Design a protein with these regions (language model features):
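Conserved phosphate-binding/catalytic loops in two-lobed NTP-binding clefts
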Residues: 28-31
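Conserved helicase C-terminal RecA-like lobe
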Residues: 5-21, 33, 40-209
Length: 209
């Protein structure tokens, strides 16, 4: 049905919108691919720093915050009854961890500041650069596929604006009166729908990709 992985996104979107079951053989759905999940995780943090997506990207790309460190942060947050983000912003127990955690918090805060007033497609571009994801995947053997998929997220963002009748330069982080939410949240809701696990079930009559 398609020539490359990135092209599958439009087909998946159409099938999901029309409640047509499908299966992808030998691959993952677009929004389930690692690099795409990384991008959407950062987007979710822009929308809500308290989101659990923090666990996915706090060390992606690698920045010295491994599993053991994350367990410490998680335990500390639970013991204090605060969120992971709150715990990161005021961690004082370990100077080395304070530096690493502070650097991550700064990345997210700077990213959000840079995205104020930008359209969704531009927001994705900022995320790719400021998160370090683009540079990280450029160093991978399969960089062409990875970068193409991340670039397709930009196309998906632009397409989502058109499909929902949103002005091309409408700010992604501001609440849209017609939508009742920000364009960013609307896009993330659509991404979650397209990544729904129900399409992985065994269905006799389905589109095979």
């Amino acid at each position: 049905l398609y020539r490359n992985n990135a092209q599958s996104r439009l087909i998946e979107q159409y099938l999901t919108a029309n409640a047509v079951p499908y299966r992808i053989y030998g691959g993952l759905r677009f929004f389930d691919r690692a690099e795409v999940k990384d991008v959407t995780a950062y987007l979710r943090l822009l929308s809500n720093p308290e989101d659990t997506s923090l666990l996915r990207v706090i060390n992606q790309p690698p920045r010295g915050i491994g599993l053991t460190t994350m367990e410490r942060i998680t335990q500390e947050a639970q013991s204090r009854g605060v969120t992971l983000w709150q715990c990161l912003t005021d961690w004082q127990q370990d100077p080395a961890l304070v530096r690493r955690a502070g650097a991550f918090v700064s990345i997210i805060n700077d990213m959000k500041a840079a995205c104020e007033g930008l359209s969704l497609a531009k927001v994705v571009e900022v995320v790719l650069e400021k998160s370090g994801l683009k540079a990280f995947y450029e160093g991978k053997p399969d960089k062409d596929i990875r970068l193409e998929n991340m670039g397709e997220v930009i196309n998906a963002a632009s397409g989502w604006y058109k499909e929902n009748g949103i002005e091309e330069d409408a700010p992604a982080l501001d609440v849209n009166e017609d939508l009742g939410m920000s364009p960013l949240d609307g896009f993330l809701s659509q991404a979650a729908l397209e990544a729904d696990d129900k399409n992985e079930e065994e269905v006799r009559d389905c589109v095979q990709m």
